[in-house]
Amino acid sequence: MLTRREMIGSLGALPAASLLGPGRLYAEAVSELPRRTLGRTGRQVVPLALGGSASLSHPSEGLDAADIIVRAVQLGINYLDTANAYGPSQVIYGDAFRRLHLTPTDPDYNLPLRQSLYVNSKTSARYAAHPNPPQGWEPGPPRLAINDLKRTLTQLFGDGKGYIPEGAYLDCVQIHNMSRMEDVDQVYEGFAARGSFDRPERIGTIAGLLDYRDGTNYTGLNPEHRVWVRHIGITGHASSPILMRAVRLDEQDILDTVLMALNANDRLYGSNQNNILPLAVARGMGVIAMKIFADGAMYGAPKHSLTSAKDVILSVGKPGAISPKDLIRYPLALPGVTCAVVGIGRIDRHRPEADQLVANLAAAVSDMPSELERRRIEKETAERQGADTNFFQEKRADIVQPTSIQAKKDSERVIVEWNTALAGPEPIRSYEIRVGQRIVMSLPYRPQLTEAPLRAFLPASEVGEEAITVVASTAAPREKA
């Protein structure tokens, strides 16, 4: 068995000319890359995923950006990410896929390689059909989800002009950047009317994509019964509560993946790791971490979304800054995280130590930090890089206590219902049910899986006429006081 040093050394030495690798050592190295299960998709993916932004969305002049994708596939990375919102990223993927013989019309089409990859794109559209689509967060004309799906397929596997070859498909399409509660309402609009004779004019993205996942035509948007999508997911970096509501509304387990911001400063903000992450894991979703370097802000990039090639970080880390190895290992050590999507600014086939792909992959397959070491990484990140890196994420200082608390008498018992609390920097470990000032029940925390409220049952004899409250606590459950 190869040591990690031998494995990364052999991968880092892979030349540009060899698309199949230089022999036994390379094949052994790729086969030994660890893989994790992407939730209920059942797919096995390497813990480092290739992001579709950075030099793929903002390539510098003269850069062969497609070679970044070729290099990633050569190194054994099999989760590949892009988006309709990422400028030329999808077109660059198409160039790389032609070099790798991944287009179905290629006489040398490499079907086994295609089947080993998990190709994911995103749509910012909230509707699949709408007579007057609302303007979304993405610049330009309003978008519709099925148009974005077709655009992705033609750019990745077709001619980029509308032609989609037979056999083309995406492993996943994610609804991009869910950042408002209104987004959640819109993407679910018309879902309940799927298959009805009176089709609504406005059909949300979920219902539209579901037809292209299942080969159905309940929305009237898939008359040829195409099966172009294997899985559907969501993404978001601004707010855990928004993603949590989208997941809770999904009572049919349609949403298989969630891409969320998870970096070493996460607990200084909305603490996705203590809110949406445990819910997604409980629902069996595949969890992908993003914003590992905070769009480069960890290494001096402006604290805003990437707008030009000059903002792309090209080095492996930065002198005096926290190690990129630590930043990558941090989210991958969180329970339930499958992989981390990281954009690449630069590769170097001649100097592996300067190759971001090699460095990031080496970090992703190294030993994971303990909880104590994660706290060290958090402290060092805040001290060296500052606590203000996550410009894209809401701040929340402490627990938001449960809402909609109700108590209903049912014969000899009282049913207590409430909607979930939101955690701050520390995870919620218990719910305390209080009658007046007395704690009458202490329950282990559990995520609220659907819109149905959380419940507990009390003997009516313990309640009397005093008010009932539910309090979230970071302490472990305790015995009745």
Question: Where are the predicted features?
Answer:
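Conserved aromatic anchor
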Residues: 414-425
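Hydrophobic faces of well-ordered beta-strands that scaffold small-molecule active sites
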Residues: 46-50, 80, 119-121, 173, ...
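N-terminal binding-site loop/beta-alpha segment at the start of enzyme catalytic domains
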Residues: 2-118
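Recognizes extended acidic, P/S/T-rich segments that occur
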Residues: 430-464
